[in-house]
Amino acid sequence: MARPLEEALDVIVSTFHKYSGKEGDKFKLNKTELKELLTRELPSFLGKRTDEAAFQKVMSNLDSNRDNEVDFQEYCVFLSCIAMMCNEFFEGCPDKEPRKK
């Protein structure tokens, strides 16, 4: 039986490949594929913003090598940044129960 972290890694990889390669390179997300992934898999990230300028900024920030596509490494960096933001948010929350030392 897979452990929760192993399952999470599987979801990260399989979600990328679910959307990549529908058009063009099967190992990269183009703009359309990325927008579909974010809209369906991370709806709270984009929120109600559906304007093209906001999405273009997200794409530009993710596309570190400026090839107009997001490869798996760029996708993982993006997810890592989201995870760090979530962690920082929860660091400010008091524990409900004292932590064991």
From Swiss-Prot:
Chief place where the protein resides: secreted
Binding-site residues, Ca(2+) 2: 63, 65, 67, 69, 74
Pfam family, one: S_100
Keywords per UniProt: Acetylation, Calcium, Cytoplasm, Metal-binding, Nucleus, Repeat, Secreted
EF-hand domain segment(s): 12-47, 50-85
Keyword Acetylation tagged: yes
Residue numbers bearing the N-acetylalanine modification: 2
Places the protein is found: Secreted; Nucleus; Cytoplasm
One GO CC annotation: nucleoplasm
Keyword Lipoprotein tagged: no
Gene Ontology MF terms: actin binding; calcium ion binding; calcium-dependent protein binding; chemoattractant activity; identical protein binding; RAGE receptor binding; transition metal ion binding
UniProt cross-references to InterPro entries, sorted A to Z: EF-hand-dom_pair, EF_Hand_1_Ca_BS, EF_hand_dom, S-100_dom, S100/CaBP7/8-like_CS, S100_Ca-bd_sub
Reported consequences of knocking out the gene: Deletion mice are fertile, grow normally and exhibit no overt abnormalities; however loss of S100A4 results in impaired recruitment of macrophages to sites of inflammation in vivo. Mice also show decreased metastatic burden in lungs of PyMT-induced mammary tumors which is associated with reduced vessel density.
Domain of life (superkingdom): Eukaryota
Residues carrying N6-acetyllysine: 35
Gene Ontology annotations of biological process type: positive regulation of canonical NF-kappaB signal transduction
Tissues where this protein is expressed: Specifically expressed in different metastatic cells.
Induction line: The mRNA coding for this protein increases in abundance after serum stimulation of quiescent mouse fibroblasts.
Binding locations of Ca(2+) 1: 28, 33
General function of this protein: Calcium-binding protein that plays a role in various cellular processes including motility, angiogenesis, cell differentiation, apoptosis, and autophagy. Increases cell motility and invasiveness by interacting with non-muscle myosin heavy chain (NMMHC) IIA/MYH9. Mechanistically, promotes filament depolymerization and increases the amount of soluble myosin-IIA, resulting in the formation of stable protrusions facilitating chemotaxis. Also modulates the pro-apoptotic function of TP53 by binding to its C-terminal transactivation domain within the nucleus and reducing its protein levels.
Subunit structure: Homodimer. Interacts with PPFIBP1 in a calcium-dependent mode. Interacts with PGLYRP1; this complex acts as a chemoattractant that promotes lymphocyte movement. Interacts with MYH9; this interaction increases cell motility. Interacts with Annexin 2/ANXA2. Interacts with TP53; this interaction promotes TP53 degradation. Interacts with CCR5 and CXCR3. Interacts with FCGR3A; this interaction inhibits PKC-dependent phosphorylation of FCGR3A.
Protein name per its UniProtKB record: Protein S100-A4
Organism encoding this protein: Mus musculus (Mouse)
